């Protein structure tokens, strides 16, 4: 190992990964993913789909998850800066409904590993950001789930100024809270 540093988070399973960066007068080189290094760090997943999105400042995406086809995700920022959040939705977890957030940026080059059964979202802090992520299952459009980003029962402390007008999809504006989600899982 030695090519990555792995920081465990307060919520079991979440990990912040910092790669080794090798720079000189030409620029830099880093491995964004090496199966052997990640396996040695306890992240032994097979990723089957890579995605990339671009967003402008104050875009908030999330909080998303797949219900019947949950995905582990490895997320990073290629350009710009975001505040990235995961919310524990694992049934029976001692930290169910708790959240963890981390700044991911092109400058700090950190990555965030999010296990299955977490809701995930981010807000763009820079003027523009490109966001890339690997998933362990394919996207299933009919299996989308979500929780509203500002659910007071979760209490995410988004680093956005009061009164900031967020840019969100209509779908993300309509998600219910974690209580509604929990109730729907009990009944469904």
Predicted regions and their residues:
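Non-catalytic, conserved peripheral segments adjacent to functional cores
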Residues: 1-107, 126-128, 135-188
